[in-house]
């Protein structure tokens, strides 16, 4: 199975677009892109230029793809345009636009389907289904939370691509594997490779709580320990924050300890993540000082969350 990381946050754009070539088929997952957040350490003009550049790259990959997959309806995961290069004569496998979906995504899904009507060859709802084509198996999870349980961001689908004995999981926006269902899926499927969305640490103290960062760290360590996945590509939301090597310090330390490759999409291409390059060249934006989120910080954060009845005490057993 050949994998191309088409557009990712570690490249300097909001995206998780990936191309798989397996079983004689070309499968493009989440063909969407948006420009990075204001705290990203690149000038606005450069962020806009990168988004335009990678949109063209996505269009070129879509043009030669057989199957397009859309795991949910946020704009960094699909492009809502009547664009023959993107959607003409494609098999389109989609997150259900009517079930297990919040109002915002439902409206976007309806707009998207109306916009591309008549362009794709086939449009199929994918939630919980398996599709087989000449030895290739594409399996979809049931809807998973876009982050923590009950979030108003709605649901996403994870994708399992299997070509013979080789298996890869693309998590989509599970926001750092905070919830058990997303982690259990990966452990149960035991992929050879994993492409995962890291936690949105740039929203810490606002939308994301520190105890959820701690849960994410423990769950990613569990995936490293309990699966054969190697390499593990961790990217997307996490790579919007130049503090990420310190905030996810314990995970990177653990991966080295057990001999697993934990990398960003850009590092798989042999390049430094854009957020670190931007910070090095342009200096800080939102955060000027911070501490490593080390083992003691994780323990203290989880204990406080348990004391405040925010999470069950079982989390303390994972420390």
Write out the residue ranges for each language-model feature.
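Binuclear metal-ion centers of metallo-dependent hydrolases, dominated by the metallo-beta-lactamase
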Residues: 124-128, 212-319
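Active-site environment of divalent metal-dependent phosphoester hydrolases
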Residues: 13, 73-79, 99-102, 175-180, ...
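Active-site metal-binding motif and surrounding structural segment of the metallo-beta-lactamase
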Residues: 43-94, 188-195, 202
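Active-site neighborhood of phospho(di)ester-bond hydrolases with catalytic His/Asp-centered motifs
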Residues: 28-32, 65-76, 93-96, 169-174, ...
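Core dinuclear metal-dependent hydrolase active-site scaffold
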Residues: 1-63, 112-181, 273-276, 280-319
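Short, flexible/disordered intra-domain loops and linkers
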Residues: 39-49, 104, 204-212
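P-loop/Walker A phosphate-binding loop and immediately adjacent motor/lid segment at beta-alpha junctions
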Residues: 21-29, 33-38, 79-101, 210-211, ...
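Metal-dependent catalytic neighborhoods of phosphoester/phosphodiester hydrolases
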Residues: 79-88, 105, 110, 244-247
């Amino acid at each position: 199975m050949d994998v191309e990381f088409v557009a990712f946050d570690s490249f300097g754009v909001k995206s998780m677009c990936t191309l798989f070539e397996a079983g004689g088929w070309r499968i493009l997952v989440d063909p969407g892109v948006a420009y990075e957040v204001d705290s990203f350490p690149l000038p606005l003009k450069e962020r806009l230029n990168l988004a335009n550049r990678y949109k063209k790259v996505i269009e070129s990959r879509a043009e030669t793809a057989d199957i397009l997959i859309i795991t949910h309806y946020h704009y960094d995961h699909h492009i809502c345009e009547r664009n023959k290069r993107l959607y003409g004569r494609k098999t389109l496998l989609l997150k259900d636009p009517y079930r297990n979906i919040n109002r915002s995504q439902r409206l976007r899904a309806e707009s998207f389907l109306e916009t591309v009507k008549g362009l794709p060859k086939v449009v199929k709802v994918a939630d919980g289904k398996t599709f087989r084509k000449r030895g290739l198996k594409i399996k979809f999870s049931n809807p998973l939370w876009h982050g923590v349980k009950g979030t108003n961001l709605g649901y996403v689908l994870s994708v399992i691509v299997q070509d013979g004995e080789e298996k890869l999981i693309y998590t989509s926006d599970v926001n750092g594997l905070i919830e058990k269902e997303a982690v259990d899926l990966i452990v149960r499927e035991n992929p050879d490779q994993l492409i995962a969305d890291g936690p949105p640490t740039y929203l810490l103290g606002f939308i994301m709580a520190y105890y959820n960062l701690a849960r994410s760290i423990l769950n990613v360590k569990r995936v490293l320990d309990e699966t054969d996945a190697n390499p593990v590509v961790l990217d997307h939301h996490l790579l919007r924050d130049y503090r990420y090597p310190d905030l996810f310090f314990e995970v990177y330390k653990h991966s080295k300890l057990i001999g697993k490759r934990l990398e960003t999409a850009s590092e798989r291409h042999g390049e430094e993540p854009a957020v670190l390059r931007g910070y090095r060249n342009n200096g800080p934006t939102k955060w000027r000082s911070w501490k490593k989120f080390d083992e003691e910080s994780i323990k203290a954060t989880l204990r406080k969350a348990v004391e405040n009845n925010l999470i069950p005490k079982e989390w303390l057993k994972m420390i």
